[in-house]
Structure formats: C-alpha cells, structure tokens
Amino acid sequence: MTAGLCVCVLLAVLCTSCLGHPISSQHLDEGQRSISTPSEALLEADTHSLGEPHLRQSRSAPQLKSLPVAEEDGDSRANLSELLARLISSRKGSVRRNSTAYSKGLSPNHRIADRDYLGWMDFGRRSAEEYEYSS
C-alpha cells in the first residue's frame, strides 16, 4: 500500500517538475515556425487550408539561458533514474525484512498455532463446529 503511494507521489513530482520547465523553442529560418504540440500543428494545418494567415503570439516570459536540450535531457534522466534506483533498492530491503518476519511462523503460544491456518482464514465454520446449537 505504501509502495503504491510512494510511486504515485514520485510520479506527481516528476509530472510537476516536467510541466514547470519552459518549453524550449528552436530558432529556425524566417519562413519556418517551430510547432511544439500536436494541437498547434492541427491549428496551423486548418488555418493554412482556409487561406487565413496564422498569427502566433509570443510569451512575455524573460529569455533564460538555454542549455543544449540533449545535455539537459540526459542529465535529468540520469538523475531521475538514479533516484528511482535508490528508492526501489531501499523499498526492497524493507519488504524483505517484513516478509521474513511472517515466514518464520507463529510462536508456540499463539492462539491459532494448533490449527491448520496456512495463509487463509475460515471465519465462522470452525466456531460453528465447536459449538452445538439447540434447534
């Protein structure tokens, strides 16, 4: 249960960090435009088919120093894969420790040590066999 929660939190953090990065735009020739999403490609195709000029608004965000996309992408993937490997290895250790505690068996003074419950519970049937009810 907690492993699933950790994975969901990790995915949420990764999604928000990816959405927080500005979209890198490539400077192309004067006649060409950079299309960053498929919806923009469809919009541009529709406007060209109708014969209307497509006007693109520029964002008012300040220009940041842009690293080469390949280096930035490679570094972030390496960091994320390293983080994920550490998280998985730490979770495997705790799962193994917990599973060995259960695989050792029950102590002799445990309440159901004399019964044949091997990983399943049979609620009601054994208690009904032990007691006779008057009809």
Curated annotation (Swiss-Prot):
GO BP term (any one): digestion
Modified residues (Phenylalanine amide): F123
Keywords recorded for this protein, A-Z: Amidation, Cleavage on pair of basic residues, Hormone, Secreted, Signal, Sulfation
Signal peptide: 1-20
Post-translational modifications reported in the UniProt record: The precursor is cleaved by proteases to produce a number of active cholecystokinins.
TM ranges: none
Keyword Signal assigned: yes
Any one GO molecular function term: neuropeptide hormone activity
Cystine connections: none
InterPro entries, sorted: CCK-like, Gastrin/CCK, Gastrin/cholecystokinin_CS
PROSITE patterns in UniProt: GASTRIN
A GO CC term assigned to this protein in UniProt: axon
Basic and acidic residues: bias regions: 45-55
Role description: This peptide hormone induces gall bladder contraction and the release of pancreatic enzymes in the gut. Its function in the brain is not clear.
UniProt record similarity statement: Belongs to the gastrin/cholecystokinin family.
Stated name of the protein: Cholecystokinin
Organism annotation: Paralichthys olivaceus (Bastard halibut)
